[in-house]
């Protein structure tokens, strides 16, 4: 069954421009307070100019282009401009450092990069020291370094016509994006997302929050994450609504932005809710038009009730991951909600709780949350150039193993129990314990290392490192944290260090993480 009517992203934007014309499609607010607005017609023209820019730089169907950007209009232009010519977006987490960014460049096979001046020195170093296929860089800032192979994105874009010059044949099965996501292995995996995936995500997420064309969907979530792209942007655009993209989250500014743009839908993670609750109470706390607050794990009942009562909102719980594209389990429009349930399986999906032998479990028993969808349509297609990893989580008949544990009740409501093995959830970011352990193990004074997540009142979990030193060595906290800051993204740097004589292990030699907190 073709739910999206065979419509790829190029056709979507041409149709949206025709149908909604001068209606506001996108509002972007920078951290400095600069606001840019685009109608559906204007946004489609900017997307076409960007597509033409890429074509003039030699980008063709199937080529990969990396984006290392904070939330900005250029991210939207590039995302859909690439899709219009059949090229593939590779978004890079804007918080990543040199080694991590270089690894994604190498393993995505990206040949062009769009970034800003603040990240340019890092990529200049990557070009000099790492083997990549990168042959050109576009900077979104006006000022340009005097280097070959570097262009001004804005200047080149503004020289292009507003009609598309290169329109190769497209299929909804074509890859639109490769999104690298943290896994339980030492390196992230590239989640392959098709035109169909993104079109379906728009319709599905719009259904989930009953979105209409008079809605305003505001998000502060980073554009390089799946939730911003599929739960927010694709939903808003698919419904002809207005999408408000704020560059960075500020607890002090958030409610003012909600009120200023008359937002009717927004999304929050627990860190946001906790930081909003510590702001001074205001008579304007409930002066807004919010109908739904899309919410993602994990919050206590007391925190949830206090937030909803103070701000006069209700939470729409949604559970998913990059591989599921959308929140495949969640609350439904017009349906009852059962906190702390994460909801019920959405349309086009099946969900089961399975035991260690991959057998379905009855209601009330804890096991692995498994989801059935259609690869490349309602769930991800595959991991890029990694068939072994794909086969490990995705069965031939479409059952996806999430690695998360939970249970369901007799009415089909699901409940989340625990995170995937060896993953830490920190302020909306997934952090791989194995990745951090491999980095820290390179320190010459460290013999053994394990990192775990511990409860944090603001950011869900903090990162704690337990280390065993080589005989005769000493290691100060200052030296340890400086090493971490130099070798990993800021959000991955542990908050706590404990030096031990040994680490607890079971009879097979595996570290017993539950004994370390």
UniProtKB/Swiss-Prot annotation:
Question: Which keywords accompany this UniProt record?
Answer: Ligase
Keyword presence, Ligase: yes
Which GO molecular function terms does the record list?
Answer: carnitine-CoA ligase activity; crotonobetaine-CoA ligase activity; medium-chain fatty acid-CoA ligase activity
> What does the record give as the reaction this protein catalyses?
4-(trimethylamino)butanoate + ATP + CoA = 4-(trimethylamino)butanoyl-CoA + AMP + diphosphate; crotonobetaine + ATP + CoA = crotonobetainyl-CoA + AMP + diphosphate; (R)-carnitine + ATP + CoA = (R)-carnitinyl-CoA + AMP + diphosphate
Give yes or no: UniProt keyword Ligase.
yes
- GO terms classed as biological process: carnitine metabolic process; fatty acid metabolic process
Instruction: Give the signal sequence positions.
Output: none
Q: What class of enzyme is it?
A: ligase
Annotated pathway, please? Amine and polyamine metabolism; carnitine metabolism
Its Enzyme Commission number(s) read 6.2.1.48
Q: What does this protein do?
A: Catalyzes the transfer of CoA to carnitine, generating the initial carnitinyl-CoA needed for the CaiB reaction cycle. Also has activity toward crotonobetaine and gamma-butyrobetaine.
Family, similarity comment: Belongs to the ATP-dependent AMP-binding enzyme family.
- Cited NCBIfam families: PRK08008.1
Q: What is this protein called?
A: Crotonobetaine/carnitine--CoA ligase
Q: Recall the taxonomic lineage recorded for the source organism.
A: Bacteria, Pseudomonadati, Pseudomonadota, Gammaproteobacteria, Enterobacterales
């Amino acid at each position: 069954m073709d739910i999206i009517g065979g419509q790829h992203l190029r056709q979507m934007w041409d149709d949206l421009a025709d149908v909604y014309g001068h209606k506001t499609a996108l509002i972007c607010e920078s951290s400095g307070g600069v606001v840019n607005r685009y109608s559906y017609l204007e946004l489609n023209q900017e997307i076409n100019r960007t597509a033409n820019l890429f074509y003039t730089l030699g980008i063709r169907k199937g080529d990969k282009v990396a984006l290392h950007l904070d939330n900005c209009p250029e991210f939207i232009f590039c995302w859909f401009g690439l899709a219009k010519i059949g090229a593939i977006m590779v978004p890079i987490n804007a918080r990543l450092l040199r080694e991590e960014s270089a690894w994604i460049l190498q393993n995505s096979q990206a040949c062009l990069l769009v970034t800003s001046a603040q990240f340019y020195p890092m990529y200049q170093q990557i070009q000099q020291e790492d083997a990549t296929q990168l042959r050109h860089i576009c900077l979104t800032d006006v000022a340009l370094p005097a280097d070959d192979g570097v262009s001004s994105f804005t200047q080149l874009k503004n020289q292009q016509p507003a009609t598309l010059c290169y329109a190769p044949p497209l299929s909804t099965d074509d890859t639109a994006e490769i999104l690298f996501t943290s896994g339980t292995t030492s390196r992230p995996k590239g989640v392959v997302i098709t035109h169909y995936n993104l079109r379906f995500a728009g319709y599905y997420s719009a259904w989930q929050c009953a979105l209409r064309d008079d809605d305003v969907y505001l998000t502060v979530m980073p554009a390089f994450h799946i939730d911003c792209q599929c739960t927010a942007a694709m939903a808003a655009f698919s419904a002809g609504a207005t999408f408000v993209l704020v560059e960075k989250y500020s607890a002090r500014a958030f409610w003012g932005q909600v009120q200023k743009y008359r937002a009717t839908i927004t999304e929050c993670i627990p860190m946001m809710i906790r930081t909003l609750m510590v702001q001074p109470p205001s008579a304007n706390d409930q002066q807004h038009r919010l109908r739904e607050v899309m919410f993602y794990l994990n919050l206590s009942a007391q925190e949830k009730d206090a937030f909803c009562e103070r701000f006069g909102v209700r939470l729409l719980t949604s559970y998913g991951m990059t591989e599921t594209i959308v929140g495949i389990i969640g609350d439904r429009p017009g349906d009852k909600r059962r906190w702390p349930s994460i909801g019920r399986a959405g349309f086009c999906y099946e969900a089961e709780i399975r035991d260690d032998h991959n057998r379905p479990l009855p209601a009330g028993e804890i096991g692995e949350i498994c989801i059935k969808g259609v690869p490349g349509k309602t769930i991800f297609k595959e991991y890029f150039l990694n068939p072994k990893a794909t086969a490990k989580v995705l069965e031939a008949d479409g059952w996806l193993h999430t690695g998360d544990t939970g249970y369901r009740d007799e009415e089909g409501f699901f409940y989340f129990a625990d995170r995937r093995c060896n993953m830490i959830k920190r302020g909306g970011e997934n952090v791989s314990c194995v990745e951090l352990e491999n980095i820290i193990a390179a320190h010459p004074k460290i013999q053994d290392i394990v990192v775990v997540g511990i409860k944090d009142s603001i950011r869900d979990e903090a990162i704690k490192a337990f280390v065993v030193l080589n005989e005769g060595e000493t290691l100060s906290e200052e030296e340890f944290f400086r090493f971490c800051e130099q070798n990993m993204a800021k959000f991955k740097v542990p908050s706590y260090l404990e030096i031990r004589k040994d680490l607890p292990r079971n009879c097979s030699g595996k570290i017993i993480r539950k004994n370390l907190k």
